[in-house]
Amino acid sequence: MLRVTIIDSFGQIIISRVENATLAYDLINSIKDIDSYVIEEVS
């Protein structure tokens, strides 16, 4: 399980859990104007 934390250019924070890296990058690519993101492995 991965936790994806995304901060967009408006300062909004989006936190989501996904099953694998493919889904994590699909999520990241679906959001416009990303300022930064972190992908962490969680149990």
Which residues make up each language-model segment?
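Hydrophobic beta-strand residues in large extracellular and virion-surface proteins
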Residues: 4-6, 18, 37-39
